[in-house]
Structures are given as C-alpha cells and as structure tokens.
Amino acid sequence: MKDDNCIFCKLANGDIPTNSIYEDDDFKVILDASPATKGHALILPKQHYANIFEIDDETLAKAAKLAKKIMTHEKDVLGCEGYNLVQNNGEVAGQTVFH
C-alpha cells in the first residue's frame, strides 16, 4: 500500500527523482538531501508504514540486513568509521515524516 500524500512513498516509488544508491522490490535507499554526515542515507520501504509498530517482522528484518549492507559498503567506499542507525517513532521522538 502507498499513501499518495506521503513524501517518502513518492520518493521510494519513483514519483519524485532521488539520488538513489540501492533499490530492490521492497526498498529504495537514497542519499539525504541535507545530510547530517558523510554517507547520510535513508532506507525507504516502498510500502507505507507510519511507524515501526505497523511494519511486519519480515520486512523489518530485511531493513536491518539492508542497513548492514549499506553501512558495510559506505565503510569500504567512503571510509566511514562510525554509524548512527536512527528510526524515530512518534512526534515526541522526533518523527516528522510518518512513513
């Protein structure tokens, strides 16, 4: 399911051009438009999930494996020495896009 009003759905599904670094049937990984650090990337599921409580366990596990794959690639290519893996859930936790 996609949400036509969700900016991340539009980015993940190609409705808006992106700096994509990886894509498969379930996810698109893009470089952040305003990166906080070198290699700042967003792992976007192609299906709409407002928060971690809506995503099924299988897709969540795939996202974790993909995060490791992307971080390993960035370590090798960009020389990144450390990583932040962030997933904000809820407005009080800093979530601004509910995807």
What are these language model-derived features?
Residues 1-99:
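HIT superfamily nucleotide-processing domains
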